[in-house]
Regions:
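Extended, well-ordered protein cores
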Residues: 4-453
């Protein structure tokens, strides 16, 4: 694009120079003509001035139009593998100066209903042949921070059961992250009644504010960190409000961000107790995240250092699971197991029938809290049978292409060996059926551009 703009500028300059030369030539010829025709000099001068002014306006207008064609705003999805256009913050590592930023008031979700609003159809996979390992961030609208739908009640019940059964194994807050956890609680109590007024109602409780869940009757007291009059960890209170899991990263004096607060109840394949207190880099290396050292560590570190309260972002990922358990995938082993070599999708049962295959997609938001400086992850899991999403136009062909594009490291991380043969055979069959049924294959590219849907 920069080369194109440069060439256009050079071309415009040449046009201006040629125009000026032609003006001079024409003026000389014009004066000769006037002299031969015995026309008054004053009239000739006015005519020449008019012609010169008209030429200058034409050249100026062409340059103005060229300038307006140049891109003046950064793209909505920045490439964080390249150098960031923003300077690193002018503060020592581990020190945060509170920001005056206030989250914009959320607009009510149009026609939202606890019974009829369906989960958003995230399908965050792309056609091969290349699988790019990037952070995959895009800008977030503040209205979109938390997504709730007609699966809210089942998620709420499952979370309540997990809290009762596993308690601190799933929810922890370190003392140095308590201020961030309380700030997150305040943010949710401010946001949810604005975005979902038919489900949440803001309340005045004593000296502070609170919120009531109109479906469950729960009352949340921000000032007292209490639910229904009983004190609770603020992260536990937050977890009860929404369908997402939550994590807060806090920067220490070494410049690294540590997982110091979390409510991880529905992760499926990783445990908070294994990662709690770790820096971001160790969390990823201990989990064998593909390409982390080579492609992700530096841009991720830069991103966390530079993210500002007014600039939240989103990302999506996906996995294949071979059982129907949302909270913990039982096919990979016991949630309390201490396996040599770790536990993950690569320890799942092998070659189970496709009826046992589920599509597990995460929609994550990241934002910095303005007062405490903590960086909050919200992790919303969407969970559907493969046999359901494979009925959607283009999905089986696109998903099969994406799976085949995984490299060896990605394939191991996602457990492809455990289900690949069975799943790909099924997806190929469903894609062939769609093509035979008249699917416009040329339309696939248009669908792919709708990422992450």
């Amino acid at each position: 694009m920069s080369d194109l703009v440069t060439r256009l500028e050079e071309h415009t300059t040449r046009l201006a120079r040629d125009a000026q030369h032609h003006c001079t030539t024409i003026q000389t010829q014009f004066n000769t003509l006037l002299k031969d025709a015995n026309i008054q000099p004053k009239v000739a001068l006015y005519a020449a001035l008019f012609f010169a002014t008209f030429t200058w306006l034409a050249i100026t207008l062409s340059r103005l139009l060229l300038t307006r064609r140049r891109p003046t705003s950064r793209p909505s999805t920045p490439n964080l593998e390249k150098r960031s256009p923003f300077k690193a913050p002018d503060r020592p590592p581990g020190v945060w100066h509170p920001s005056p930023f206030t989250r914009p008031t959320a607009s009510p979700y149009p026609n939202w209903s606890l019974s009829t609003t369906k989960p958003l159809p995230y399908r965050p996979f792309r056609y091969g042949p290349k699988y790019n390992i990037t952070m995959g961030l895009r800008n977030m609208s503040w209205d979109e921070w938390i997504e709730l739908d007609n699966e809210y009640s089942s998620y709420h019940s499952l979370k309540a059961a997990r809290i009762a059964e596993r308690g601190e194994k799933c929810i922890k807050t370190a003392p140095e992250a308590m201020s961030a956890a309380k700030e997150l609680l305040e943010e949710l109590v401010g946001y949810l009644p604005q975005r979902y007024p038919s489900l949440f109602q803001e309340m005045k409780l004593g000296r502070g504010k609170g919120m009531k869940n109109l479906e469950t009757g729960e009352v949340f007291d921000v000032e007292g960190c209490a639910r229904d009059g009983e004190r609770e960890d603020p992260m536990k209170m937050c977890a009860r409000m929404i369908q997402d899991d939550l994590a807060i990263m806090v920067e220490k004096e070494d410049g690294q961000y540590y997982l110091l607060a979390g409510a991880i109840l529905l992760a499926g394949f990783w445990r908070l107790e294994d990662k709690f207190g770790m820096p971001l880099s160790t969390i990823h290396t201990s989990g064998d995240v593909p390409g982390f050292k080579d492609k992700l560590e530096k841009p991720m570190s830069n991103f966390f250092r530079r993210i500002q309260p007014q600039s939240p972002v989103l990302r999506n990922n996906y996995f294949i699971q071979v059982d129907d358990k949302l909270a913990w995938s039982e096919s990979i082993g016991s949630e309390d197991a201490k396996e040599d070599g770790g536990i993950g999708w690569f320890t799942a049962e092998k070659n189970k029938a496709v009826d046992h295959h589920w599509f597990r997609s995460e929609r994550q938001s990241l934002r910095r809290l303005p007062k405490s400086g903590g960086v909050v992850f919200t992790i919303r899991t969407y969970f559907h049978p493969i046999t359901d999403i494979a009925q959607e136009p283009y999905v089986p062909g696109r998903l099969a292409s994406a799976i085949r594009s995984w490299g060896e490291d990605v394939s191991r991380y996602k457990g492809k060996e455990m289900y690949g043969d069975v799943l790909l055979e099924y997806l190929d069959k469903k894609h062939a059926e769609q093509v035979e049924g008249g699917l416009d294959v040329d339309g696939e590219e248009d669908v792919a551009r709708g990422y992450p849907f």
